[in-house]
């Protein structure tokens, strides 16, 4: 595993997240930035996923259950070469393929249309069960927000996965402790996740969601588990990489203005030349 290469991918992905949301003047940057390291490791070190097999069912599949983090998924697809980087600037525009929430009918590499929180987990369970019935050895991964876990459907799906002993399923909890209304513990407080998933018959691993080595080890361990699904509880920082967004619930679903965008790009060590490279011109009043 080349840590420096992964860091470069993650930096590119975070930069593109900022470009998408800023250019659209809409979107969800906080959770997208926070989960970038998780998906960087997953897509570049773990999953059987390439530009060539993106349109095939004969590969590992991923369900972004927290569908509002679509800027992250689109940035991943661009980094993998599935779509052109320039298309990211059509995010949330009229007639775009890059809608505010992922649509499997629009792009290869999107395995489930998501957005209504909690439903993606059930879809992932169904895919894993179908793979077993089809004698398909490919794995199913799903990313769940900690705020999303306030949805009862998450736990119904978790119970079903444990019952069917779906060892080809790996769920990742993006535990950043924040949601649109503030701290998750002040809203409903779905944590602690470890004890709850174990009670439903899951193998559970807790990791730092920004530690590439720990993430890779967790995904590798999940592949060895037999007779039960795996839940990776990844502790993350919402808005990771952008100084004024880190650990701020207010950046859950808000776009930065032009000045803030410049600061964010500088934080990501890319600078304004990235913005100019794609000839983006946008003036936003503070």
Listing of model-derived features with the role each one plays in the protein:
Residues 1-5:
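Non-catalytic, mobile gating and regulatory segments of ester bond hydrolases
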Residues 9-26, 174-176:
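N-terminal capping segment at the start of a domain
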Residues 17-21, 32-163:
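Cofactor-binding active-site loop characterized by glycine-rich and histidine/acidic residues
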Residues 80, 187, 246-250:
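Short secondary-structure boundary/capping segments
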Residues 109, 113-116, 121-225:
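Thiamine diphosphate
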Residues 63, 170, 206, 231-233:
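Structured core elements
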Residues 68-69, 73, 176-177, 211, ...:
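Glycine-rich beta-alpha junction loops
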Residues 212-286:
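Glycine/aspartate-rich loop-and-adjacent alpha/beta segment that forms the canonical ThDP
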């Amino acid at each position: 595993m080349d840590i420096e290469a992964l860091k470069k991918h993650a930096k590119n992905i975070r930069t593109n997240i900022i470009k998408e949301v800023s250019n659209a003047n809409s979107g969800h940057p906080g959770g997208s930035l926070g989960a970038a390291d998780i998906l960087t490791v997953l897509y570049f070190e773990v999953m059987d996923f390439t530009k060539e097999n993106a349109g095939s069912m004969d590969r590992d599949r991923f369900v972004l259950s927290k569908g509002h983090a679509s800027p992250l998924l689109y940035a991943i697809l661009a980094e993998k070469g599935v779509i052109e980087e320039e298309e990211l600037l059509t995010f949330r525009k009229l007639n775009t393929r890059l809608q505010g929430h992922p649509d499997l009918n629009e792009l290869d590499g999107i395995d489930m249309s998501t957005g209504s929180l909690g439903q993606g987990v059930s879809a992932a369970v169904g895919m894993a069960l179908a793979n077993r019935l089809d004698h398909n050895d490919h794995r199913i991964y799903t990313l769940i927000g900690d705020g999303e876990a306030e949805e009862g459907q998450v736990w119904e799906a978790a119970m079903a996965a444990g019952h069917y002993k779906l060892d080809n399923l790996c769920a990742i909890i993006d535990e950043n402790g924040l949601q649109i209304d503030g701290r998750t513990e002040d809203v409903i407080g779905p944590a602690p996740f470890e004890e709850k998933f174990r009670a439903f018959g899951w193998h559970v691993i807790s990791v730092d969601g920004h530690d590439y080595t720990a993430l890779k080890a967790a995904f590798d361990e999940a592949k060895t588990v037999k007779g039960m699904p795996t839940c990776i509880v990844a502790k993350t920082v919402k808005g990771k990489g952008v100084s004024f967004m880190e650990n701020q619930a207010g950046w859950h679903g808000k776009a930065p203005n032009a000045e803030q965008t410049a600061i964010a790009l500088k934080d990501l060590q890319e600078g304004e030349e990235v913005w100019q490279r794609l000839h983006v011109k946008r003036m936003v009043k503070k």
